Amino acid sequence: MTVTEATGWYLRGDVGYAFTDLRGARYFQGSNATEVDFDDADLDDAWTIGGGVGYQINSYLRTDLTFDYLTQADFRGSTVGQCGFPLVDCTSSDRSSLTAYTLLANAYVDLGTYGYVTPYVGAGIGGSYVKWKNLRNVACADDGSFCDDQVTHGGKGNWRFTYALMAGASVDVTCNIKADVGYRYLHIDGGNMFGYADNGGPGRDKGLSVHEARVGARYLFGGCAQASYEPPPEIPLQQPVYK
């Protein structure tokens, strides 16, 4: 078997572990004229799984369209204010979670092949649909004397602009299968997070920064070809010449 010229369509599949960083969150406190930051806003890590279709243009340039799913990442936050009657200082504990679907158009530069290994860099642009579940918050007096009833704010979902930066290396497994190990950074814009309830909200997040460690594989159609049979050259037979 021989490897044909590195061009043609391919399919890809990837899984990854996502170190997610919420760049903060804001909400309207008591009035739509007063927007304040969450005092704490933390998002747990999650997993990603995805796939795509692409085209290897030549030995150095390829492009693909990918669709990925970010599994549930739990949110924990807190805010400070006043609650009860008469009003006393309170701290609110907030809980929610999100998932995200990301669609990207990507381009990569393969930096040459060294043995079986081809390092690359790349970038992508597209959008992410971020879906927040309901946000539940309970406000408790700082002196521990009481807690208000839980308030539930309806979660929001929307599409956000997203870009990606990638680096990694592929390893030739067979003539048409490449293993892929890499890093991807996703920048997801901010958007709506939860709605109004009980004199609080709506709220929005400031966006996500996602650092992914990824492994996957690419299957290149037509990457293998049978070496064609070439018969040995014929040796011309020359009749003897008699003088």
Stretch-by-stretch model annotation:
Residues 60-63, 115-117, 171-179, 223-228:
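Repeated loop/turn-to-beta-strand initiation elements of outer-membrane beta-barrel proteins
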Residues 13-17, 51-55, 105-109, 123-127, ...:
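Residues on the lipid-exposed face of transmembrane beta-strands in outer-membrane beta-barrel proteins
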Residues 11-14, 66, 166-193, 203-212:
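K/E-rich alpha-helical interaction surfaces of small helical-bundle regulatory domains
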Residues 3-7, 56, 114-115:
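Extracellular/periplasmic catalytic domains that process cell-envelope and extracellular macromolecules
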Residues 10-12, 62-64, 118-122, 178-180, ...:
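Residue-level detector of the transmembrane beta-barrel scaffold of outer-membrane proteins
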Residues 10, 207-243:
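Outer-membrane beta-barrel "beta-signal"
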Residues 20-45, 68-102, 127-160, 188-212:
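Extracellular/periplasm-exposed beta-strand and loop segments of Gram-negative cell-envelope proteins
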Residues 1-50, 216-222:
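Short glycine/proline- and aromatic-enriched beta-strand/turn motifs that initiate or cap beta-hairpins
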